[in-house]
């Protein structure tokens, strides 16, 4: 995973440098018409050197550690160690998971049989009763 991140970071840097070089070339072409070719070439070299030496303060390819468990690869919101188990069983199937994660929840969203149709007016007839 780290190798993939490094490869992506290298590719992104190369793409950014190519785009910057193209921008500098276009800028120098338009500028050379005003000032002369020698000055434009010198300016182009200075801009390219500045762009290649640029290092961001917080690089994206640096490993990120979780604030809760301290392990690299996840962040606090996605930490698998912070997942709480539900206090009660699932009201739909009785399993040990949250209601929103129930595999039996709303298998078919088609119309309900007449015996299950409620007299509620706040939702469509074929909607899931557990939403």
From Swiss-Prot:
UniProt keyword Zinc, yes or no: yes
UniProt cross-references to Gene3D superfamilies, sorted A to Z: Zinc finger, CCHC-type
Domain of life assignment: Eukaryota
InterPro entries: Znf_CCHC, Znf_CCHC_sf
Keywords carried by this UniProt record: Metal-binding, Zinc, Zinc-finger
Gene Ontology MF terms in the entry: nucleic acid binding; zinc ion binding
Zn finger spans (CCHC-type): 64-81
Protein name: Putative uncharacterized protein COL25A1-DT
UniProt gene name: COL25A1-DT
């Amino acid at each position: 995973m780290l190798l993939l991140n490094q490869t992506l970071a290298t590719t992104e840097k190369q793409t950014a440098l190519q785009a910057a070089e193209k921008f500098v070339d276009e800028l120098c072409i338009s500028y050379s018409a005003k000032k002369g070719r020698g000055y434009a070439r010198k300016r182009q070299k200075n801009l390219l050197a500045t762009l290649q030496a640029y290092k961001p303060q917080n690089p994206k390819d640096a490993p990120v550690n979780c604030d809760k468990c301290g392990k690299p690869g996840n962040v606090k919101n996605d930490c698998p160690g912070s997942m709480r188990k539900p206090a009660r069983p699932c009201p739909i199937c009785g399993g040990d998971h949250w209601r929103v994660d129930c595999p039996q929840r709303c298998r078919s969203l088609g119309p309900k049989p007449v015996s299950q149709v409620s007299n509620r007016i706040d939702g469509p007839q074929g909607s899931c009763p557990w939403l």
